[in-house]
Regions:
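Bacterial N-terminal signal peptides that target proteins for export
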Residues: 2-20
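C-terminal motif of bacterial Sec signal peptides marking the signal peptidase cleavage site
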Residues: 28-32
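Short S/T/G/P-enriched beta-strand
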Residues: 34-79, 102, 124-180, 192-205, ...
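An extracellular/luminal cadherin ectodomain-centered signature
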Residues: 44-48, 90-91, 107, 187
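Low-complexity "stalk/linker" and mucin-like segments enriched in Ser/Thr/Pro/Ala/Gly
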Residues: 55-60, 92-108, 190-221
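Short, surface-exposed loop/turn segments at beta-strand-coil junctions that are enriched for proline
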Residues: 108-114, 226-232
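Append "Rare intracellular matches occur via the same short Y/T/C beta-strand/loop motifs
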Residues: 115-122
């Protein structure tokens, strides 16, 4: 009896065996799969790696934060789960907003759209998809919430996370400027009393040094304070953060933006 081809997709890394069909899934990418028949040189599944950038600027090529052009990466696997050299990979997009080179996969943004555009990678009969947003060129970056304070607690660490320190990315010149959404901004602590005292975190409390601007062009990071590294239980001081955006590898005008958190004990 021959089993029909089946394909499954999961968000976590794992290997699934179901009804005689093997689906090899890796985090950070989408997959396509088919039945297990064939030799060790036959492609059973493909993985399309997550793109290094969440968006492509209209009128430009999809690039990473260094300014380098992004070439989409597709991996192929045989029925043993081993990576093999695939037959030629072909790329296309069924959506407006981008054009995709069918051979290299290089993406160019040509117009804004309200939803992400799909990039489809095809190897033989297998297909996998990644999505990319369209955005505007960032011309300036400036502080949105440049200064805030944190009343820390020695005993209750849930209180030791600051409000969000934020910046805004804009395209064009005021008053005719526009928000730049879906764009990467990096944050770095450049000054603090102890190198282990504060760390940058996201909304979920996980350490993170980069953020992607929201629909209004705002990005930010919080600071988690580690009281163990205070010089005393009454220390009052500040932590300074720089926020930087890059375009074509060069810093965007206004970078780095200086953000300051004042921390103090309860009064």
């Amino acid at each position: 009896m021959r089993l029909s081809p089946v394909c499954y997709s999961f968000s976590r890394s794992r290997t699934i065996v179901l009804a005689g069909v093997l689906a090899v899934v890796s985090a950070g990418g989408t997959i396509g799969c088919t039945d297990v028949s064939g030799s060790s040189t036959s492609v059973l599944s493909i993985q399309f790696d997550t793109l290094p950038s969440p968006s492509v600027v209209v009128g430009d090529t999809l690039r990473d934060t260094t300014g380098a052009v992004i070439r989409p990466v597709v991996h192929a696997f045989n029925f043993k789960g081993a990576e093999i050299l695939p037959t030629p990979v072909f790329f296309l997009s069924p959506d407006s907003g981008i054009t995709v080179d069918s051979v290299t996969g290089i993406v160019v943004g040509d117009s804004l759209r309200s939803s992400p555009a799909r990039i489809v990678a095809t190897v033989g009969r297998l297909q996998a998809i990644q999505k990319v947003n369209l955005t505007l060129r960032p011309d300036t970056i400036f502080a949105k919430n440049a200064f805030d304070s944190l009343v820390y607690s020695i005993s209750d660490t849930t209180k030791d996370v600051s409000p969000m320190l934020t910046v805004m990315l804009r395209h064009g010149v005021a008053p005719n400027d526009s928000a730049v959404p879906f764009y990467i901004v990096s944050f770095t602590i450049v000054s603090q009393p102890d190198p282990l005292l504060g760390e940058l975190v996201n909304d979920g409390g996980t350490a993170a040094h980069v953020d992607t601007t929201d629909a209004t062009g705002i990005a930010g990071r919080k600071i988690r304070l580690h009281p163990l590294h205070l010089s005393s239980a009454t220390q009052v001081d500040s932590i300074v953060v720089n926020a930087t955006a890059r375009s074509h590898g060069a810093v965007v005008k206004g970078s780095p933006v200086r953000l300051v958190l004042l921390f103090k004990p309860p009064s």
